């Protein structure tokens, strides 16, 4: 059983504040939610279990029980998850406020301990102080957190997470902030709490405390497309697709890291809760993570033999050719932008090959093919430029004054001509490596200009950002029929 979840269940009965703050979906009536196989810790109840996606950010960080309340760590309502979430630079005073919140919600004194023990001793089998019956009293106060970086902002979700060695398929990683506070001060807080426990429970409390307060922080993970709802990933091929998210909001005017102080001002806290409401947003999927996901899907379907072929049709329209026909049944081709990029990239590459190398048919096996597989993955800049450089070297360039040149005297389509004029200013007959890189970047940037894209999607924005963008009608970036250049 998750210690934090058990503590919330038992402590919510001691007063009105706790009954409101410590209410978890996992301790209420179960409601069905989409089943998944993603393993990790639910940020709401801190138990390790199968996770489902959050309706506020579409990331997998909530269990199927807690999902009924739709709480997200990016919310603006001061529920327990939001009050445990800190942002960016965390100071010693912030951590002191967090510890004070824990002490307020999970008090430990002789009266509380006796009350829980008396309530638990219902049968003879419960007369001994066994850990399974008193799990809620064994919640130490630690500065253990799950952290994540979203477009330059780092979030720390504090809690008590059991079984730290279990499988973690979420983008969150364990971070210990005890060094920012003070180990000895935190020890003193926990030793005082531990002194009220029966001797048989003190050892277990101490073991739990030291294991969760002395661990080494993990390296922070990189957020990728697999961390978001499969429903979003499956619809990326639709250019007009918008993600629907809901956020729990209120008139919370505190600084982000000061929300935990509200439990000290009970009347003010309940006044803020009276303003609670749900806001709905429809946001664009445009970001580097999802763009890279789409380009990678298209990269797996590349037919490199087209660059040596004599087909009169565009690369995605070749049929009945064993070496060049692209499988158009994949949904990635439903996005006309991906199709346009693929056609123009391969039209340009074929013109380079035909202008510089004597290869007559697509059935031939050439070394250049192995470098073509990465030409769409422009998000991985180093790998992409390496593949372009290798392709350039396969064209047998001529070197003059330490600069290598290749010819461009083969026919190209009008789209590529427009890109050449836009990027170079004319349709050249001689190109350097830098020219080739610039042209191929321009072909991709016409639809997916990653230079000006945020890394993560808008679903990871805070309420303040979403409201500002919604006011300026920018939650949907642009009409799907208009390119980034336009």
Curated annotation (Swiss-Prot):
GO molecular function: metal ion binding; RNA binding
Residue ranges of the motif IKBKB-like degron (ILD) motif: 479-483
Family from the record: Belongs to the rotavirus NSP1 family.
Highest rank taxon of the organism: Viruses
Single GO biological process annotation from the record: symbiont-mediated suppression of host cytoplasmic pattern recognition receptor signaling pathway via inhibition of IRF3 activity
Protein name: Non-structural protein 1
InterPro entries: Rotavirus_NSP1
Function according to Swiss-Prot or TrEMBL: Plays a role in the inhibition of host innate immunity by inducing the degradation of key host factors required to activate interferon production such as IRF3, IRF5 or IRF7. Associates with components of cullin RING ligases (CRLs) including CUL1 or CUL3, which are essential multisubunit ubiquitination complexes, to modulate their activities. Recognizes the host NF-kappa-B regulator BTRC through the presence of a DSGXS motif in the C-terminal substrate recognition domain.
Compartments (UniProt record): Host cytoplasm, Host cytoskeleton
Organism, as annotated: Rotavirus A (isolate RVA/Human/Japan/IGV-80-3/XXXX/GXP[X]) (RV-A)
């Amino acid at each position: 059983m998750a210690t934090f979840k058990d503590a919330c269940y038992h402590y919510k009965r001691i007063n009105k504040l706790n009954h409101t703050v410590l209410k978890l979906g996992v301790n209420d009536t179960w409601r069905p939610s989409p089943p998944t196989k993603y393993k990790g810790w639910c940020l709401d109840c801190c138990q390790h279990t199968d996770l489902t996606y959050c309706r506020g950010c579409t990331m997998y960080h909530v269990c199927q029980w807690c999902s009924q309340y739709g709480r997200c760590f990016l919310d603006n309502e001061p529920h327990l998850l939001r009050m445990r979430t800190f942002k960016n630079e965390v100071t010693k005073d912030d951590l002191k406020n967090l510890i004070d919140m824990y002490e307020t919600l999970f008090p430990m004194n002789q009266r509380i301990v006796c009350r829980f023990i008396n309530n638990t001793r219902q049968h003879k089998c419960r007369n001994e102080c066994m850990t399974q019956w008193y799990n809620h009293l064994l919640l130490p106060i630690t500065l253990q957190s799950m952290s994540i970086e979203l477009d330059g902002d780092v979030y720390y979700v504090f809690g008590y997470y059991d079984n730290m060695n279990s499988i973690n398929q979420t983008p969150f990683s364990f971070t210990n902030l005890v060094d920012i506070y003070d180990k000895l001060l935190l020890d003193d807080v926990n030793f005082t709490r531990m002194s009220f426990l029966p001797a048989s429970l003190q050892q277990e409390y101490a073991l739990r405390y030291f294991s969760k307060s002395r661990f080494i922080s993990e390296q922070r993970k990189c957020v990728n497309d697999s961390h978001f709802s499969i429903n979003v990933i499956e619809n990326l091929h639709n250019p007009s697709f918008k993600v629907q998210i809901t956020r729990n909001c209120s008139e919370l005017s505190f600084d982000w890291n000061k929300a935990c102080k509200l439990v000290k001002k009970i009347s003010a806290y309940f006044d803020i809760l009276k303003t609670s409401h749900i806001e709905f947003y429809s946001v664009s999927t445009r970001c580097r993570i999802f763009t890279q996901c789409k380009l990678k899907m298209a990269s797996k379907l590349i037919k490199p033999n087209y660059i040596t072929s004599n087909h009169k049709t565009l690369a995605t329209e070749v049929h009945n050719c064993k070496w060049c026909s692209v499988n158009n049944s994949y949904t990635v081709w439903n996005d006309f932008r991906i199709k346009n990029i693929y056609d123009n990239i391969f039209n340009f590459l074929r013109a380079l090959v035909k202008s510089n190398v004597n290869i007559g048919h697509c059935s031939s096996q050439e070394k250049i093919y192995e470098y073509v597989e990465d030409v769409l993955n422009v998000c991985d800049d180093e790998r992409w430029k390496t593949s372009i450089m290798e392709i350039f070297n396969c064209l047998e360039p001529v070197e003059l004054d330490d600069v290598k040149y290749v010819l461009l005297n083969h026919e190209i389509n009008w789209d590529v001509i427009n890109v050449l004029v836009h990027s170079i200013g004319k349709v050249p007959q001689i190109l350097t490596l830098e020219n080739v890189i610039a042209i191929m970047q321009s072909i991709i940037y016409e639809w997916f200009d990653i230079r000006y894209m945020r890394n993560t999607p808008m679903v990871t924005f805070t309420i303040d950002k979403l409201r500002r963008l919604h006011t300026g009608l920018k939650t949907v970036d642009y009409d799907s029929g208009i390119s980034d250049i336009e």
